[in-house]
């Protein structure tokens, strides 16, 4: 197939097809994330079709534009780099043991802190805490450094272990199970409650609950620039299992 045979058509606001005659040989899509960023994806076995789709999407859409690739997929990374995108950040995926005998964590609470199990938090107060830590993260590193799944989740107390201090929620740990492997999506502590062992206690309670439920492992994604989270997870025996690259077109 020669590039001269290809035609790229925008079939919807955020969808494109690459056609060779009457055959669809590639598809492109732009998907908005909850933080407002637009992420691109292209599905094609043909390099020429990929290049033409990428060029059309980059020309049609407002910048900045983003995509995420598995770091071991060198061919896909090369396609996007050839289109002009640059690597913005790296995210590590960790395989996290849940057994307290391995992690060294227990379910004990720091002095003055109460840890509420999954489903025990009051929804309104949990939403208030979520808004507080969201604003604090945005003012510091920014939510663009966070995994996409944690940017704007629905608030379901069943997915949260929560720390309370003097009647006020101080920290949370969100765990979901999109597959058989539970995912630790977010650990966050209010800025005025840092350095009290709350994050470690939240993680200990969450992992202990998963272990008692028969889950030997969980997963977590951590931005490589997040030294505190990296240190916390590696100290309990978590191991890197994969990595993803986020690329950007400006």
Predicted regions and their residues:
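A conserved beta-strand-loop-helix scaffold within acyl/acetyltransferase catalytic domains
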Residues: 30-35, 141-189
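Conserved GNAT-fold acetyl-CoA-binding loop/helix
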Residues: 1-7, 131-150, 156
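Conserved active-site alpha-helix within GNAT-family acetyltransferase domains
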Residues: 71-90, 196, 200, 224-242
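A short beta-loop-alpha structural element at the N-terminal edge
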Residues: 8-10, 113-128
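Acyl-donor-binding surface of acyltransferase catalytic domains
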Residues: 44-112, 245-249
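Conserved donor-binding loop and adjoining core beta-sheet/short helix segment
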Residues: 2-61, 69, 170-182, 190
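Conserved GNAT acetyl-CoA-binding A-motif
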Residues: 61-72, 210-222
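Conserved acetyl-CoA-binding loop-helix of GNAT-fold acetyltransferases
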Residues: 47-59, 189, 195-212, 230-235
């Amino acid at each position: 197939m020669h590039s001269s045979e290809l035609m790229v058509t925008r079939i919807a606001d955020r969808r494109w097809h690459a056609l060779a005659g009457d055959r669809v040989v590639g598809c492109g899509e732009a998907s908005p994330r909850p933080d407002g960023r637009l992420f691109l994806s292209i599905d094609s076995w043909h390099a020429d079709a990929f290049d033409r789709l990428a060029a059309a999407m980059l020309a049609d859409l407002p910048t900045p534009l983003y995509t995420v690739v598995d770091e071991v997929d060198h061919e896909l990374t090369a396609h996007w780099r050839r289109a002009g995108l640059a690597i913005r950040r790296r995210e590590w995926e960790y395989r996290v043991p849940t057994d307290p005998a391995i992690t060294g964590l227990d379910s004990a609470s720091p002095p003055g802190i109460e840890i509420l199990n999954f489903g025990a938090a009051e929804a309104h107060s949990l939403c208030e805490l979520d808004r507080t830590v969201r604003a604090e993260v945005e003012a510091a590193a920014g939510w663009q450094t966070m995994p996409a799944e944690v940017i704007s989740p629905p608030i379901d107390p069943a997915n949260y272990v929560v720390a309370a201090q003097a009647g006020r929620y101080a920290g949370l740990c969100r765990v979901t199970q999109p597959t058989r492997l539970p995912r630790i999506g977010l650990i966050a502590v209010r800025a005025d409650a840092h350095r009290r062992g709350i994050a470690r206690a939240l993680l200990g309670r969450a992992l202990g609950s998963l272990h008692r439920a028969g889950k030997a492992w969980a997963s977590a994604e951590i931005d490589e620039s997040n030294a505190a989270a990296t240190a916390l997870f590696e100290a309990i025996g978590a191991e890197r299992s994969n990595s993803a690259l986020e690329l950007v077109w400006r």
